[in-house]
Regions:
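Conserved glycine(s) of the Walker
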Residues: 126
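Hydrophobic positions on the alpha1 helix immediately C-terminal to the Walker A/P-loop
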Residues: 130, 134
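P-loop NTP-binding catalytic core
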Residues: 24-30, 35-36, 40-118, 136-150, ...
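Short, small-residue-biased leader/transition segments that mark boundaries at the very start
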Residues: 2-10
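Amphipathic coiled-coil signal-relay and dimerization helices
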Residues: 14-21, 25-28
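Switch/coupling sub-region of P-loop NTPases
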Residues: 143-145, 152-222
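The conserved Walker
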Residues: 123
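Residue-level signature of catalytic and energy-coupling elements of molecular machines
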Residues: 7, 74, 109, 151, ...
Length: 222
């Protein structure tokens, strides 16, 4: 549990773990052929993802699960002619707001029925985890249709009182914009938009909130 949310960095230096904002280096420096082999192995484990996406675009972002271990969010990219990756461990079990010290006032946002709720902060500050807690609170207490649009999917929600439809950009839909526009025709009560990424997506999200839906999303801030 202590490693959940921590990150492992693979590039042309020793394997580096980022835990509680501290960098811990392990082993000898990796050569470019070592990083390529490790990243190729990650794509083999992920199965549904192909390394050709990385080679074509120069970067890729996806998640996958290993039974009895956990889910992993992976960002692969090319830098200085070699391959690199950042891997984050995500627990199968959804986080407990009390264990994460999320204030009760924040959790009360799950009681809203319409409007736009933004969770802001820097990378790694817990935006996605906070949203997962809010979505799970609604899932456990209300009969709603919840649609999540994420890139990639992180926490997986099981149907409880609500029905939860989870869509991943690139594997389930072309883009946030396309998925968000389509979601308005899918009878949603609650929409989770992983990130306010561009003007048109923001505009559609605001329209959804103004027309009676409850929309959750994130913004990167310093």
């Amino acid at each position: 549990r202590g490693l959940v949310g921590s990150e492992m960095c693979i590039r042309d230096r020793p394997l580096t773990y980022k835990i509680n904002r501290k960098m811990i280096r392990v082993g000898d420096r990796l050569m470019p052929e070592d990083t390529r082999k490790l990243i190729e192995d990650i794509y083999v484990i992920a199965q549904e993802r192909k390394i050709e996406t990385l080679e074509k675009n120069g970067d890729d972002d996806f998640s996958f699960s290993i039974p009895n271990l956990g889910r992993f969010r992976v960002s692969t990219y090319r830098q200085r002619g070699s391959l690199a990756a950042v891997i984050r461990l995500i627990a199968f079990q959804l986080p407990n707001p009390e264990e994460l010290s999320i204030p009760s006032q924040i959790m009360q946002l799950a009681e809203y029925r319409k409007g736009l709720v933004l969770v802001t902060g820097s990378a790694g500050s817990g935006k996605s985890t906070t949203l997962a807690c809010l979505i799970e609170q609604i899932n456990s207490t209300r009969e709603e249709h919840i649609i999540t649009l994420e890139d990639p999917l992180e926490f997986l929600h099981r149907h409880k009182k609500s029905i939860v439809s989870q869509r991943e950009v690139s594997s389930d839909t072309e883009s946030y914009k396309v998925a968000l526009r389509a979601s308005l025709r899918q009878s949603p009560d609650v929409i989770l938009l992983g990130e306010m990424r561009d003007y048109e997506t923001i505009n559609i999200a605001m329209t959804a909130a103004e027309t009676g839906h409850l929309v959750f999303s994130t913004l990167h801030t310093l």
